[in-house]
From Swiss-Prot:
NCBIfam families: transpos_IS4_3. Belongs to the transposase 11 family. It holds the Pfam family Tnp_DNA_bind. This is Transposase for transposon Tn5. It is an enzyme of class 3 (hydrolase). Mediates transposition of transposon Tn5 by a 'cut and paste' mechanism. First, the monomeric transposase binds the 19 bp inverted DNA repeats flanking the transposon. Then, dimerization of the DNA-bound transposase creates a synaptic DNA complex. After nicking of the first DNA strand, excision of the transposon proceeds through a series of intermediates. The transposase then mediates the insertion of the transposon at a new site by strand transfer. The activity of the wild-type transposase is very low, and is further inhibited by dimerization with the transposase inhibitor (inh). Changing residue 344 to A: Enhances transposase activity. Residues 369-476 are annotated as: Important for dimerization. Changing residue 97 to A: Loss of transposase activity.
Length: 476
């Protein structure tokens, strides 16, 4: 199970990295130790995570500086653990996206271009494939990462960056083997490339890709949007759009109020002229948007069936979970501290930040272990949600963590929260992070959960030390 080793940093590190092929078992053991400390003190430096031990700190730095340690081997070890976990699930989503890692300190001059040549920030571009299980959309793990530095002169590039989509597909295929038939690749508009679509279809693989280019359907001769607009409406659905600050066409910032949007759904079978590719498409388009608002519109290309309303809604639901990889990027850069690292050599920095990519996945999974009931309810699995909520909090927390959390939450537990249950633990941690549930939704934000988790962990060492002293008969 995903949660079996998740909450104990040492167990988690062992499960993810103990199979790393680093050329010497002592290096692998050191990787496990370093990863465990970085996970225990997420977002903190090696110095802080070493807990005042000079030997631990020096050992960690020696590992990070070791030229015989391959960053790619570190990433592969984590990816193969993801493959192992994936065997539990009948269907998976492979969410793909690219992000940049930006640095301005001394090492920056040896890294690649991110913006203009004049920019002081330089770094890497990283394309990631993140696996989710397709029922409750829990994060399984990282399946693949490709890192590269963009040269100042595009003519110096080894190959087109668009090749990252085909490379990710090939690596996923190799690692997943026969399980690849259970995997649906989910990509944004950048993946709307003829070679990528053709490759997925040639290998009989599944995908949902948002359309970018004004392609035409061969049979109707119409552009895809116009062709789908001519198809009968399957039905509609509503979504809630949160409040957000936006920049208008004149560059002025304004507040976009929260609203509900009604969308219509149409679908059809299409054939693209280039390569004579035949696939399915779904068009979701907002009906009667407020004056001044750009209507929501998604045109999705897919291998999945789309004949019925339920099938089309499933494709939409799959694509809406693409945002999870954006949360991974946030967890990696901010929560795990990838962009706060200050190693002075590119290779050392890459080793460190590669470890932190899996620490970031753990942060996502920690949150999801508490929010699983909400995910189950969203899929209509009410009995399953109630069953999970009623489980003991010790299924995800240690007895000491439960005891400390109970002390910190004393007098705050609501009547509907069963003492010692997972539902209570979720709400108690959220309250510790400042969640007031003023809207009576019972659903805490990412930030509140993480703040609460950090607060619990920061107090745990003192709590354990006090217990130890009391066990020795020392009054405190």
């Amino acid at each position: 199970m995903i949660t079996s080793a998740l909450h104990r940093a040492a167990d988690w590190a062992k499960s993810v990295f103990s199979s790393a092929a680093l050329g010497d078992p002592r290096r692998t053991a050191r990787l496990v130790n370093v990863a465990a400390q970085l996970a225990k003190y997420s977002g903190k430096s090696i110095t802080i995570s070493s807990e005042g031990s000079e030997a631990m700190q020096e050992g960690a730095y020696r590992f990070i500086r070791n030229p015989n340690v391959s960053a790619e081997a570190i990433r592969k070890a984590g990816a193969m653990q993801t493959v192992k976990l994936a065997q539990e699930f009948p269907e998976l989503l492979a969410i793909e996206d690219t992000t940049s890692l930006s640095y301005r300190h001394q090492v920056a001059e040896e890294l690649g271009k991110l913006g203009s040549i004049q920019d002081k920030s330089r770094g890497w571009w990283v394309h990631s494939v993140l696996l989710l299980e397709a029922t409750t959309f829990r994060t399984v793990g990282l399946l693949h990462q490709e890192w590269w530095m963009r040269p100042d002169d595009p003519a110096d590039a080894d190959e087109k960056e668009s090749g990252k989509w085909l490379a990710a597909a090939a690596t996923s295929r190799l690692r997943m083997g026969s399980m690849m038939s259970n995997v649906i690749a989910v990509c944004d508009r950048e993946a709307d490339i003829h070679a990528y679509l053709q490759d997925k279809l040639a290998h009989n693989e599944r995908f949902v890709v948002r359309s970018k280019h004004p392609r035409k359907d061969v049979e109707s001769g119409l552009y895809l949007y116009d062709h789908l607009k001519n198809q009968p409406e399957l039905g509609g659905y509503q979504i809630s759009i949160p409040q957000k600050g936006v920049v208008d066409k004149r560059g002025k910032r304004k507040n976009r109020p929260a609203r509900k949007a009604s969308l219509s759904l149409r679908s059809g079978r299409i054939t693209l002229k280039q390569g004579n590719i035949t696939l399915n498409a779904v068009l979701a388009e907002e009906i009667n948007p407020p004056k001044g608002e750009t209507p929501l519109k998604w045109l999705l290309l897919t291998s999945e069936p789309v004949e019925s309303l339920a099938q089309a809604l499933r494709v939409i639901d799959i694509y809406t979970h693409r945002w999870r990889i954006e949360e991974f990027h946030k967890a990696w850069k901010t929560g795990a501290g990838a962009e706060r690292q200050r190693m002075e050599e590119p290779d050392n920095l890459e080793r460190m930040v590669s470890i932190l990519s899996f620490v970031a996945v753990r942060l996502l999974q920690l949150r999801e272990s508490f929010t699983l009931p909400q995910a189950l309810r969203a899929q209509g699995l009410l009995k399953e949600a109630e069953h999970v909520e009623s489980q003991s909090a010790e299924t995800v927390l240690t007895p000491d963590e439960c005891q400390l959390l109970g002390y910190l939450d004393k007098g705050k537990r609501k009547r509907k929260e069963k003492a010692g249950s997972l539902q209570w633990a979720y709400m108690a941690i959220a309250r510790l992070g400042g969640f007031m549930d003023s809207k009576r939704t019972g659903i805490a934000s990412w930030g509140a959960l993480w703040e609460g988790w950090e607060a619990l962990q920061s107090k745990l060492d003192g709590f354990l030390a006090a217990k130890d002293l009391m066990a020795q008969g020392i009054k405190i």
